[in-house]
Amino acid sequence: MRCGGGARACRRACRCWLSGYAGPADGTQQPDAPEHAVAREALVDLCRRRHFFSGTPQQLSTAALLSGCHARFGPLGVELRKNLASQWWSSMVVFREQVFAVDSLHQEPGSSQPRDSAFRLVSPESIREILQDREPSKEQLVAFLENLLKTSGKLRATLLHGALEHYVNCLDLVNRKLPFGLAQIGVCFHPVSNSNQTPSSVTRVGEKTEASLVWFTPTRTSSQWLDFWLRHRLLWWRKFAMSPSNFSSADCQDELGRKGSKLYYSFPWGKEPIETLWNLGDQELLHTYPGNVSTIQGRDGRKNVVPCVLSVSGDVDLGTLAYLYDSFQLAENSFARKKSLQRKVLKLHPCLAPIKVALDVGKGPTVELRQVCQGLLNELLENGISVWPGYSETVHSSLEQLHSKYDEMSVLFSVLVTETTLENGLIQLRSRDTTMKEMMHISKLRDFLVKYLASASNV
């Protein structure tokens, strides 16, 4: 029996996948509205020039940035995302005695559920094996592919199931006492549709960095805990924002009737969900651990109960993008000769800024000044303060150009070491936020920065 139209289409899809086709690189998006197009273009241009973003203009379209199909972030963007994840970890894990860190594999066991749409990990050789038969029947193709999907692993779409697998062991860790939580940060995968896709319907894989807390609580207190985490998470996002009101929340419900809430950031093109909270009930645990219910029961006072599962999952990548939009400002440039030129600055929160201080040299003996800067750099790095070594650059720039560059890089302070420093130890310190300059003794710089960053984190 020769293969029919369905088999031929299946073969074409397999060959297209094997050839490495990934569809258009720019994604599909609606055109930017006029009211925010200029500001968006200015921000994307700044983020490209200052290496917060990485990629071509097509790869940095709104839809492409949201899809997660490209390596969106450059070195400074990666550092910003790392700082955001670190703040999340401190808030949700480090300072909470009832939350424990867990880890799970990117690959999960395959599922026999017919509607499971998770991406599968399939060897190309397995596909080529059936394609070598030039005349397979439709039934043979279907049987082969169904068996392949059942036996192959799948890429995780969420961190929830990885945390559930750790539940029983961690229940023993806390002597079965409820409530407690399991936290993890990791990469998850999702399908990205494309209206310009070929008839083979090859779907691209999008990635996102997810920050997840799975909270196990008695059912009687689950609503109170969901409200607690909602308030906590909304305040946390607003803590680092220039415009806190751009972060908002709204109730939601899934197709199974389970209630939850979503936290949104108001981008110029509209609201996007950056974090989702769900009350999943006890069914997730019962499905993960079928059989003896007593193995998953925790202690609620004197009672043994199957806990309710609360899921708090945030998109760290989208959160990073939100803070870039939130911190971007266009202000008058008092140093510009043309009034039409505006000062562009990223006023990222001090805890999130990728670089805290930049070191540059002014007039004076170059070798000696660079030695001073090198010693200062080592001292600051030892105290966990990120530094930009501007003094090592070979291209000369004016102070005005340097300040403009550092404002766009969101550098909190710039330090100028001159011949005056060699004479009496005084350096010039400029603030990103106020643009004010002051003289400070070099021996006081470290303590000043440490106290400044500590106070910023406690606000």
Curated annotation (Swiss-Prot):
InterPro entries per the UniProt record, alphabetical: aa-tRNA-synth_II/BPL/LPL, Anticodon-bd, Anticodon-bd_dom_sf, Gly-tRNA_synthase/POLG2, GlyRS-like_core, POLG2_C
Cellular localization per UniProt: Mitochondrion; Mitochondrion matrix, Mitochondrion nucleoid
Gene Ontology MF terms: DNA polymerase binding; DNA polymerase processivity factor activity; DNA-directed DNA polymerase activity; double-stranded DNA binding; identical protein binding
Keyword Protein biosynthesis: no
CDD domains assigned to the protein according to its UniProt record, in alphabetical order: GlyRS-like_core, Pol_gamma_b_Cterm
Keywords of the record: DNA replication, DNA-binding, Mitochondrion, Mitochondrion nucleoid, Transit peptide
Superkingdom, natural source: Eukaryota
Family matches, as PANTHER family: DNA POLYMERASE SUBUNIT GAMMA-2, MITOCHONDRIAL, GLYCYL-TRNA SYNTHETASE/DNA POLYMERASE SUBUNIT GAMMA-2
Quaternary assembly: Heterotrimer composed of a catalytic subunit and a homodimer of accessory subunits (POLG:POLG2).
Protein name: DNA polymerase subunit gamma-2
Organism: Mus musculus (Mouse)
